């Protein structure tokens, strides 16, 4: 089983030395380098680069630079999506963001995690669990969304939150 297959199954995998995963992250870094250096007025170029990088991009998508992610292809964003500056998505697993989602500055969405056992962690092993963010969600500044979390529809995540468990729809 390849490291990528292990990752997709939620198993521990080696993301540090696997050539396939390294090449895919390198591709994302190259696209992000270009994206993060575009002029503010270059809307068409930004959209084109997002469509090349991300797995799915709805209509009316704005991600303010700088933006960083691991692979890009695991990220799907719906219609009318806005993310302010310094969004970081560690997308070892799928990240699905619904329609009308708004993300404030300095938010981290992390599918990646590491073993609590130091010996395994020191081997460079990690896991990735998918994250789902529903429709009509607002995530406040400096919030962190951790692996495996589902955020329902019509949710507001307050600034500075660390989301470690599922949040039901219509919650604050």
PLM features per residue range, with description:
Residues 169-172:
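Conserved beta-strand-loop-alpha-helix hinge in the C-terminal portion
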Residues 67-151:
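Flexible, glycine/small-residue-enriched loop-and-beta-strand segment within the central core
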Residues 4-5, 53, 123, 130, ...:
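Short secondary-structure boundary/capping segments
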Residues 1-60:
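Terminal amphipathic alpha-helical/low-complexity segments used for targeting or macromolecular assembly
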């Amino acid at each position: 089983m390849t490291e990528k297959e292990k990752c997709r199954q939620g198993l521990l995998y080696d993301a540090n030395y696997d050539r396939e995963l390294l090449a895919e992250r390198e591709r994302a870094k190259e696209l992000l380098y270009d994206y993060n250096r575009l002029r503010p007025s270059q809307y068409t170029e930004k959209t084109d680069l997002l469509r090349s990088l991300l797995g799915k991009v709805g209509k009316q998508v704005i991600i303010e630079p700088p933006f960083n992610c691991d692979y890009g292809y695991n990220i799907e964003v719906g219609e009318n999506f806005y993310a302010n500056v310094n969004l970081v998505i560690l997308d070892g697993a799928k990240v699905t963001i619904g329609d009308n989602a708004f993300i404030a500055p300095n938010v981290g969405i992390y599918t990646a995690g590491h073993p609590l056992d130091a010996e395994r962690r020191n081997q460079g092993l990690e896991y990735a669990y998918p994250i789902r963010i529903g429709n009509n969600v607002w995530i406040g500044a400096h919030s962190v969304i951790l692996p495996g979390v589902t955020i329902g529809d019509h949710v507001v995540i307050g600034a500075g939150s660390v989301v470690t468990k599922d949040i039901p729809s219509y919650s604050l």
